[in-house]
Amino acid sequence: VDMVCVELEDGIAPKDKAEARKKALALFDNPHSDDGVERIVRINSMREKFGIEDVSAILSTQTPPPALMMPKVRSPDEVIILDQLLSEAGHDTRLHVIIETNEGLEAAYEIAHSSDRMDAMFFGAIDMAPELRCDMAWEPLLYARSKVVHAAASAGLDVIDVPYLDLEDLDGMRVAAEQARMLGFSGKGSIHPKQIPILNEVFTPSADQIARARRTIAEFEKANTGLVVIDGKLIEKPVSVSYTHLTLPTT
């Protein structure tokens, strides 16, 4: 599923916050077509004045965004409170949470399990690196990334990696995306349309991968044992289970 995120947080100057909020919420005055694109609004932190104003405006509207992205979440309480407020307003808005603070990283597991509204966790390397006093490179942030992946997986959530910031280095972005995919990320954020084709290619299973996954699952079902040999390779049951997420509809 592709996502489009409307920005209200760091990308908007304080003097422009109110106008940006008004224009962002106006985008949802009329229903959107079912085009397979999830529309999200990234609000300001609920620990800040602008975040409280964002939430207040969303609770007051009859046509809220389908989903909200919560930045700089430090504890599950923030998610629980917003969930309760949305329920009281009668909104079925979904939630996406960014883990980008040291406190949030420590509470990642609890945050992942804090609301049935949650669909995904995002890893925010840009803010996380200075929090951890490390470089914003793959190796220094590997532990933090892994912890977010583990938390999201435990709750059955998608997990999205930070966007690649060098728009001209598409080869570098491909490498970073492949590293994220191998670590367990479901996708990677994008800050420019020209990044999207490569990201879709990296994170979308190929026809061969899907066919192999289906064949492996079928072989296990037929054999009804703990392991099978396919093309000379010994494959155990846990490997078959890991293939289930690749068996997507081909439509």
PLM regions with names:
Residues 247-251:
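A short, hydrophobic C-terminal helix/tail in secreted or cell-surface proteins
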Residues 1-246:
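Expand to "…catalyze enediolate/carbanion chemistry for C-C bond making/breaking, isomerization
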